[in-house]
């Protein structure tokens, strides 16, 4: 649901739908979700990211449920989010997220989304995959490290390290 410059999403909403809804509403800042498979809840749990943007960057409010079934409302700045993790969401389950966008011409947003898609097609495998598998160490990306080890194209049975991007299997 769009309210002004905010997009209110249930945890089960697909990320592609989030980016498309934001685009149609003229809200920039959520374009990077377009190519990430999965839903809002999972993206927040792992602080999913792409194109140098992260799930917690446009987030302003989060509603969760704890193990006792109690509902909690959080301001995003009160929730710790790190590279590929959100410690709170190990103990709580995300129910709803409120993202804030920046007003922008939907055509400009569409162009940014198209640019992201093009970059993905050039740098990531197009065929079905399990996605990016490993967290990046601090000094070098996991894909670069795997590539430098000469493992691009290596396989066990039908599982193969992508020849396009070594962090994809």
For each of these PLM feature ranges, what is it?
Residues 1-2, 59-62, 159-161:
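Generic structural motif
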Residues 16-19, 39-47, 52-54, 71-74, ...:
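Short, well-ordered, mixed-charge alpha-helical segments that flank or form enzyme active sites
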Residues 65-169:
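Phosphate/pyrophosphate- and phosphate-bearing ligand-binding catalytic cores of soluble enzymes
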Residues 1-40:
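Anion-binding (especially nucleotide phosphate/pyrophosphate-binding) glycine-rich loop
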Residues 25-60, 66:
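A gly/ser-rich beta-alpha-beta helix-loop segment of oxidoreductase catalytic cores
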Residues 2-4, 44, 92-96:
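Acidic/polar active-site rim loop that often engages polyanionic ligands
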Residues 4-6, 10, 14-16, 60-77:
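Short, conserved aromatic-histidine micro-motifs
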Residues 13, 36-43, 50, 132, ...:
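Gly/Ser/Thr-rich helix-start
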